[in-house]
Regions:
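Contiguous, well-folded functional domains in the mature portion of proteins
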Residues: 1-215
Length: 215
């Protein structure tokens, strides 16, 4: 029960929590009102970097959401040219994370990471179509248990300036394993083949729990 009310925070959040805590103390030295503002800031930092445990279905017939947020795209597209897949068709689901969503990212399937590719870029609004090609982003090419290509892309947003990758090439993943996070507003794209989508645009998703697609 305690962990549900006060989930652990991601390691990336500790330094921000310390900084906001120091700011709160300094603010309190000037006035209670400023101190209250600092306290609200500290609580928000804790909330943003929360890393709650999730109930993972652990079923290779499904893909789960890599992120908390809103489904903004369900479409058929060419694969990412950065991975040499521009001549291959994929289904794609995009999940937009606002600053109030949990920003820890998880793998949608069990499998092996074949490639990780980081691309620097701009920081336009992550909900825009061009964000998937222009923004700072990080690609994971994963082979699922049936040898399908599953691509997860972390995309930095208008506010986000740091993509955190916590995985390595050739790493074996269990469904729902943490693979990284993005700080302060962002998006996650999933490219997949041989699955049928189960979600619609506008639907809310929970990382590791919401079923995105089924074989």
């Amino acid at each position: 029960m305690f962990s549900k009310i006060f989930p652990k925070i991601h390691a990336e959040g500790y330094k921000f929590l310390v900084i906001s805590g120091i700011i709160t103390i300094v603010f309190y030295s000037f006035s209670n009102f400023l101190g209250l503002i600092g306290l609200v800031l500290t609580i928000w930092v804790y909330y943003f970097f929360r890393d709650p445990d999730r109930v993972i279905i652990d079923d290779n017939n499904y893909l789960v959401s890599p992120a908390d947020g809103e489904i903004i795209k369900v479409e058929e597209v060419d694969g990412p040219k950065e991975l040499g897949l521009e001549n291959k068709r994929f289904n794609k689901i995009s999940v937009f994370m606002n600053v109030f969503d949990c920003h820890v990212n998880r793998t949608p399937c069990a499998g092996k990471i074949e490639e990780i590719l980081y691309k620097p870029g701009t920081f336009v609004n992550a909900s825009l179509d061009k964000a998937s090609e222009d923004n700072e982003r990080n690609y994971f090419k994963i082979k699922d248990t049936d040898n399908n290509d599953i691509i997860v892309v972390q995309i930095a947003g208008l506010v986000a300036r740091r993509i955190v990758c916590e995985s390595n090439k050739d790493q074996e993943l269990k469904q729902g394993d943490r693979i990284g996070m993005i700080r302060f507003g962002s998006r996650a794209d999933v490219y997949y083949e041989n699955y049928q989508p189960l979600v619609k645009v506008g639907q809310k998703a929970i990382s590791g729990e919401t079923l995105l697609a089924k074989k």
